[in-house]
Amino acid sequence: MRTLGVDLGRVRIGLAVADEILRTARAVTTVVRRTEAEDLAAIAEVARDYEVTRAVVGLPLNMDGTEGPSARLARGFAPRLEAALGVPVELFDERLSSFEAESRLRARGLSAREQRGQVDAEAAAVILQGWLDRRAP
C-alpha cells in the first residue's frame, strides 16, 4: 500500500509518497497552483502513477493547537481531494514541517534559491513521515 503526502500551500502543493512496508516517505514533486480543478487533476495524476491507496494532507495548526485560515483551507480541500482521488484522505498536524524541510535541504547543501523548488515536496515528506511514525507499532 502506498500513501500520498500533501503539503497544501497557497502558491505550491508539495507531494510525497511512502510505501507502508518500507515506512519511509520521499519527496516526489511540487505542483504550482492554478485553479482547484487543475490542482486536483495534477495531484490525481501523481496518485495514479504511484498507485496510492490513501492520502494524508497536512493540517497547519497554530503553535497553540488552534486552527487559523490555512487550517480551514486544508479542511475544506481534503474532502474534495478524496472525491478526486477515490481514496481515503486524512488530515495530519503539520506544525513545523516547513522548518524541518528547510533544515533537511540546508543539510544537503542546497542554497535558499535551490530550496525554493523543493521545500514544498520535502515538507510533504516530513508530514507523511510523521504520519507513518505515529502509526508505528
Swiss-Prot record:
GO terms for molecular function: nuclease activity. Its EC number is 3.1.-.-. Transmembrane segments: none annotated. InterPro entries: RNaseH-like_sf, YqgF, YqgF/RNaseH-like_dom, YqgF/RNaseH-like_dom_sf. GO terms for biological process: rRNA 5'-end processing. It is found in: Cytoplasm. GO terms for cellular component: cytosol. Pfam families: RuvX. Keywords: Cytoplasm, Hydrolase, Nuclease, Ribosome biogenesis. Belongs to the YqgF nuclease family. Could be a nuclease involved in processing of the 5'-end of pre-16S rRNA. This is Putative pre-16S rRNA nuclease. It comes from Anaeromyxobacter dehalogenans (strain 2CP-1 / ATCC BAA-258). The lineage of its organism: Bacteria, Pseudomonadati, Myxococcota, Myxococcia, Myxococcales.
